[in-house]
Amino acid sequence: MKIVTIVGARPQFVKAAAVSRVIRKKHEEILVHTGQHYDNNMSDVFFDELHIPKPDVNLGVGSGTHARQTAEMMIGIEDVLLKEKPDYLMVYGDTNSTLAGAIAASKIHIPIIHVEAGLRSYNMRMPEEQNRILTDRISTLLLCPTEVAVENLKKEAITEGVYNVGDVMCDAVLYYSKMLEEHPKKFYFEHLEGIYEPIDSVDEWYLATIHRAENTDDIDKIRNILAAFEELDAPVIFPVHPRTKGLVTKLRDEHKYFNILFVQPMGYLDMLYFVKHAKKAVTDSGGLQKETYILDTPC
């Protein structure tokens, strides 16, 4: 059996690795990277360190408006599907890559496997919610992480091909968290790249991320969030999302922050380490919230 797997963001590579290790024992897999998220951390070191298969195809789509990005992905994915003629197409989660892969396969009648099906926020302003609902509607096999996800699909009259298989993110976090203790704390702090000044090691910390448009597009919200970070009883390690960097830099020109360690986005294992050992995590990321639960870190 031949499966074409579509991924476009770093978390999807991590999740796909957990499944690919099993698939490739018995089946042929073609791994397609849409290029949705260009990440300097996704070098050969990223794939080697995490034992992740390197992509067989990189479409190199890059950033753009939602419509343009999704359309360009669909064109590239369709070319791959017509060439490879797979038995199934597999997609993960709720990114534009997910939707593009599902639509491209559906149009040429290739069955679709959706991993992490059935998740709902019930906020239709979120692009992720739109992507996951549309992908579920045209998928053949819907692999749900929880019984709640199964029930969500039932409410939408989707019952065929639905299975509760457990959470692949949990598999990935548990697998990679075992690798963290191979290095001392100093090793991970040496990897932190300060945006405005060098970063020194600290004994305890909070880990914070902000990336949702509801927060990043409003300078007053960012100002209030950073003010709250300043009041915490330990330093806040804050990997700054590219979307947030301009506003953060502007606010730093207005006010000196003493309790916040502004750092560049970090690699997956580094991030996992700082989440696992944080006093608490503060985030608007659904994925990170789930990781904190798995790692037993307050959030």
Predicted regions and their residues:
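Structural motif
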Residues: 2, 87-88, 205, 279-280
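A donor-sugar binding/catalytic signature common to diverse glycosyltransferases
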Residues: 91-92, 142, 272-299
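Conserved nucleotide-sugar phosphate-binding/catalytic loop shared by glycosyltransferases and other
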Residues: 28-69
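Donor-nucleotide binding loops and adjacent catalytic segments primarily
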Residues: 44, 181-277
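A nucleotide-sugar donor-handling region in carbohydrate enzymes
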Residues: 37, 41, 138-216
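Short, glycine-rich nucleotide/cofactor-binding loops
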Residues: 3-13, 211-219
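A short, Lys/Arg-enriched amphipathic alpha-helix followed by its capping loop at the start of a domain
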Residues: 19-28, 228-232
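Active-site and donor-binding regions of nucleotide-sugar-utilizing enzymes
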Residues: 4-7, 13-22, 46, 58-157
